[in-house]
Amino acid sequence: MEEYKVKFIDFLLKTGALKVFESPSEDRTLKSKRISPWFVNIGDFNDGESSNALAGFYADAVINSGVKADVLYGIPDKGVGLAAPVAMAMASKGHNVGWCFSRKDEKTHGEATNLGPEDRIKKLIVGRAPKPNDAIVQLDDVFTAGDAKYEANTFLKSLGRSNLPLLAIAVDRQEVAIDSREAIAEYQEKTGTKVVSIVNAVDVYNVLKEGNLVPEKALERLANYVRVYGTKDARTTIGTGLEQKVIGRDRSVIPACDVETLEQFEELVKQTADVEGIGGYKIGFELGLGFGLPAVVAAARKHTDKPIIYDHQKAGTDIPDTGKNYARTMKNSGVDTVIFFPQAGPETERAWIYHALDKGLNVIVGGRMTHPAYAVSEGGFITDEGALDMYRIAARAGINNFVVPGNKPDVIKQVRDVVEAEGVSPVFYAPGFIAQGGKIEAAAKVAGDRFHGIVGRGIYQAKDMHAAAVEHTSQL
């Protein structure tokens, strides 16, 4: 890594402008509404010494880009304070350029008096007003979704200033937009403006890791955030393969514990826990809401330490922010693993996955279900491609555990192809047997080496639950 990048990150840390939080209570909400465990505030450079140093880093970024600059434009709000200092720093390095930023309100007095329409820009700009053909280099602090950058681009072009070759920022957070497109790549494509940054998220991560500059937990939280929200390059560099191992074996049967009472649940666990092929226990809202998750987990722990998987029918269908509280509740209850069906969209999916990982929970993601008329192709509401996107986004975040409909082998094949295309080696969990017509052996054949059949009534309604568990596990 270039020496100036290391120096800049060290500078950010020493000034307190870069913060990586160990505790979720310190997290910051970004303009994009994402809740982030790391934050850069260029506004913390608010004295002469730090502003001068910051300007030098920006000047190097602009000069090293090789792009010709006539005028620097500070994008409101954080970029306004950058324009003049960066111009001064560039002058000290042999590059004399103008600087400017926009007014909140059009000026009507002083030098703005009696200006013609062609000079209207002088009423709206503080500093040197760019000429029509001037190369305008825009300055801002960070790039997340890019809202302020698009607004600045539109503003300058409305004044007839369309020569906008470069945007220089301090930190590229390397995040994808809501539609999963890479935010900076999309901005460059739409505007024709090249973006350069002093450092990016991966640079920050690598320097912090190599120098042991933040607590291990804080670094882990930063890594998980980038895995979920990061661009492909960022995810690949940090490492997307979480390889969460929910079940201690490659194939098993998981009883779906949809029983009415806590006593019935405990008896189910007691009779099946010693069956070698039983991998864990899936509980749902009836037990969870009826008796409280801590009590349900405690009942299971009397007989087994096999994982407890909570399927809230269907978690991940609420707004993104609620994922944080959900994950905290699950962790406090003693649940090991959560199942999400993120039908509320990509931002909800990313948020719920991130917060679950942040709490140390295992995550299983579903998109297709066992019953008729779920997907559009079956007469339902959810588009087939939309359901596949639920799996795709999860795979890009490093998730490797997925729920698939065991009675629809063709769908299992589709999902497998999608997640393997993202570089993930999947582990599948499939309901849909017995009452819904699926065959464990047929689903397992399509799913591959790592497969767990979810069986409900076929076990808990059997006269001999132990014998039923043995029978179902023999089909693996």
Residue spans for each PLM region:
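Active-site-adjacent beta->alpha loops and helix N-cap segments on the catalytic face
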Residues: 262-265, 287-302, 317-325, 342-361, ...
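Conserved anion-binding
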Residues: 136-138, 250, 317-409, 423-425
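PRPP-associated nucleotide enzymes
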Residues: 1-139, 144-245, 267-273, 286-291, ...
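Surface-exposed amphipathic alpha-helices with a cationic face
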Residues: 153, 157, 246-247, 273, ...
